[in-house]
Amino acid sequence: MDGLVAQCSARLLQQEKEIKSLTAEIDRLKNCGHLEDSPSLDQLREENLKLKYRLNILQRSLQAEKRRRPTKNMININSRLQDVFGCAIKAAYPDLDNPPLVVTPSQQPKFGDYQCNSAMGISQMLKAKEQKVNPRGIAENITKHLPNNEYIDRVEIAGPGFINVHLRKDFVSEQLTNLLVNGIQLPALGENKKVIVDFSSPNIAKEMHVGHLRSTIIGESMSRLFEFAGYDVLRLNHVGDWGTQFGMLIAHLQDQFPDYLTVSPPIGDLQAFYKESKKRFDTEEEFKKRAYQCVVSLQSKDPDFIKAWNLICDVSRAEFNKIYDALDITLIERGESFYQDRMKDIVKEFEDKGYVQVDDGRKIVFVPGCSIPLTIVKSDGGFTYDTSDLAAIKQRLFEEKANKIIYVVDNGQAVHFQTIFAAAQMIGWYDPKVTQVTHVGFGVVLGEDKKKFKTRSGETVRLVDLLGEGLKRSMDKLKEKERDKVLTEEELTAAQTSIAYGCIKYADLSHNRLNDYIFSFDKMLDDRGNTAAYLLYAFTRIRSIARLANVDEEMLQKAARETKIVLDHEKEWKLGRCILRFPEILQKMLDDLFLHTLCDYIYELATTFTEFYDSCYCVEKDRQTGKVLKVNMWRMLLCEAVAAVMAKGFDILGIKPVQRM
């Protein structure tokens, strides 16, 4: 097979060279000006047309050959069916520009496995050209032009022109075997492409609170998704580590720990330390003046003040890392301070191109289509968030050479980022058709009273307290089910952590990120419905089926290579198709950046598995002795495929399942 592809490729290259040579010769003859009726020119034209025709056939053959080559990757069936129907529509209606191509999974078994719903749209296009054609007739014409393929068993036309597609059972069985033998692999969709994901971004000297939870969880999951798709992902933590607040913190540090340069100050509670310094800043005029002097010294890079700044950042960083480690978050810190030296050049570039206006001492930039201007220099000469965000986006585009930049920041910052992106386009830093820069917004976390999530005293909920409460609640739930009497201490702790952090993450990710969501430990720890608790329990049950039947990993691998997966029962067929939709789900998320789609899919997979398991015996036992009489190996393989897909889905969501719960 490889030899044939290589041979086709070589012929293709040779014919492309011949076409270039002939085209050059035709151009030369045209330029002579007196060879309009030259037989030489006519002969060359004819030869060129023949070569182009043969080249077109070769290109199509090569593409088809590559499609037929065995691959270790999971196939996106929806995408393959779109290719097939795209060819059919082009052949049936060659004169239509960009006809609609709509292929979706069927919602009910009676409508087949997939549906092509293009006929109605094509009917409208033909009507606009004053050609009246019934959509059903269009559907019939499309089906007549379907090319030979390995995916479709048969098609049916239903209603006004829906084309119901039934997949070949052998094809589905082969794809499931491929998944089991080679693991879950995607084609290298992001090969040689770089994605930057900017998320979490807490402020130094302030504790992380529930408001940071969504950005951190969504950003981590999004990073994992792009990494799995083969992208080079840079995860950035744009912490607030610069600004006037450091003046008051350093001044307070000098007063509280005068020997801080030689003895590391024991700042136990940085939040309390911040509040004390803020109180002094607001009430003591002398302290306020000294705080401003400290800012000037810090900005001029005085070594003693840089050391004080580093000490404060280190204390904060240690607290942040406790939360990141608990939630298995990976980030590279690159705060506002990183961009300070670039800001003067940013201002100069906007000035040189005539975009800067002065308003009450401020330097502002109006951006077309945006109602609020950017302030790039304050009236006191200082820079702003606008300046640092412009410096950041330029660095990411020109130095990091990112193909995609994703900012995971709450919906309240939507206008700010729209303006930053528009300014970057206006000044010529990037073309949105080439580089994708996206604000991934999200709603706020609400309490059960449907107001912003607060403590009983009305304060913002500290993230460390929230995680601690989650651990306590999950242990209570496990003990309520008497799992402490079955699991070892190590297994119990692993289950506690898996449930606590998994439920917190899943409760966030399972909602459409644009919406606010209600935080409720009771709901997220419920082991019924679309919750992490239910899915984690389902996963451990699936994993236990082989174990209880005394089927080990080696036996499963041998069976995957040698046993054909039979899909004769309707529940086997439904489960097999559901498993193979995984690449489609991932592609949709890569396109629209909505992660709840994956949560919905994993839940659908788990419930489809339950239907299968209730109807199809995987293991047959003696009812009296419990002795295993028969193991239906192809069904065990279906169990294994479900577990493999769920495990990868959990990994993308940042959830760690356990083998026993």
Curated annotation (Swiss-Prot):
One of its GO terms (molecular function) is arginine-tRNA ligase activity. GO terms for cellular component: aminoacyl-tRNA synthetase multienzyme complex; cytosol; nucleolus; nucleoplasm. L-arginine binds at S201, P202, N203, H212, Y385, D389, Q413. One of its GO terms (biological process) is arginyl-tRNA aminoacylation. Its EC number is 6.1.1.19. It holds the Pfam family Arg_tRNA_synt_N. The modification N-acetylmethionine is found at M1. Gene3D superfamilies: Arginyl tRNA synthetase N-terminal domain, HUPs, Isoleucyl-tRNA Synthetase, Domain 1. The alpha-helical N-terminus (residues 1-72) mediates interaction with AIMP1 and thereby contributes to the assembly of the multisynthetase complex. Interacts (via N-terminus) with AIMP1 (via N-terminus); this stimulates its catalytic activity. Interacts (via N-terminus) with LARS2 (via C-terminus). Monomer. Part of a multisubunit complex that groups tRNA ligases for Arg (RARS1), Asp (DARS1), Gln (QARS1), Ile (IARS1), Leu (LARS1), Lys (KARS1), Met (MARS1) the bifunctional ligase for Glu and Pro (EPRS1) and the auxiliary subunits AIMP1/p43, AIMP2/p38 and EEF1E1/p18. Interacts with QARS1. Part of a complex composed of RARS1, QARS1 and AIMP1. This is Arginine--tRNA ligase, cytoplasmic. It comes from Cricetulus griseus (Chinese hamster).
